């Protein structure tokens, strides 16, 4: 029954639908792109290990990453987490930050955005320049 409500090509998991977009955009443009897809659609927020694993599986089967030779070409993938002006990490969909999988314990000193780290097979998050262009994941609740 989870399938109901997901747009064709999107992956259902635990009441949400996930879509991977290979086009490379800055964090802000990626978030705007997601929002244009639907009222409740944003860059993905991740709240537990199971959700994170589901996203990793989706990326593993997504076109740009299915061929290991191509992996370096695309690199990291944007998620909806960024350092706000108040110096707090916040999800773009407004949900609570209640889970983390940071690549290293570096707290950035300036505005920054989080991406899934490709060298860690997307199992960890790293801090990136928000202006960097990367593929991204959008999500919405069903």
UniProtKB/Swiss-Prot annotation:
Gene3D superfamilies: Mannose-Binding Protein A, subunit A. Its main location: secreted. One of its GO terms (cellular component) is extracellular region. SUPFAM superfamilies: C-type lectin-like. It is found in: Secreted, Extracellular space, Extracellular matrix. Residues 13-139 form the C-type lectin domain. PROSITE patterns: C_TYPE_LECTIN_2. Disulfide bonds join 6-17, 34-138, 113-130. A minor form with some unmodified Ser-68 and partial phosphorylation of Ser-66 may also occur. The modification Phosphoserine is found at residues 62, 68. InterPro entries: C-type_lectin-like, C-type_lectin-like/link_sf, C-type_lectin/snaclec_domain, CTDL_fold. GO terms for molecular function: carbohydrate binding. Keywords: Disulfide bond, Extracellular matrix, Lectin, Phosphoprotein, Secreted. It holds the Pfam family Lectin_C. This is Dromaiocalcin-2.
């Amino acid at each position: 029954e989870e399938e109901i409500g997901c747009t064709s090509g999107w992956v259902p998991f635990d009441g949400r639908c996930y879509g991977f977009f290979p086009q490379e955009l800055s964090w802000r443009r990626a978030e705007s792109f997601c929002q244009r897809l639907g009222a409740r659609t944003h860059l993905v927020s991740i709240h537990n290990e199971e959700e994170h694993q589901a996203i990793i599986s989706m990326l593993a089967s997504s076109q740009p990453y299915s061929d290991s030779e191509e992996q370096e070409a695309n690199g990291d993938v944007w998620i909806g987490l960024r350092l706000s002006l108040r110096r707090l990490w916040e999800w773009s969909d407004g949900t609570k930050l209640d889970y983390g999988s940071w690549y290293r314990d570096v707290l950035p000193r300036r505005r920054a955005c989080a991406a899934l780290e490709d060298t860690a097979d997307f199992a960890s998050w790293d801090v990136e320049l928000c202006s960097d262009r990367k593929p991204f994941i959008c999500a919405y609740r069903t």
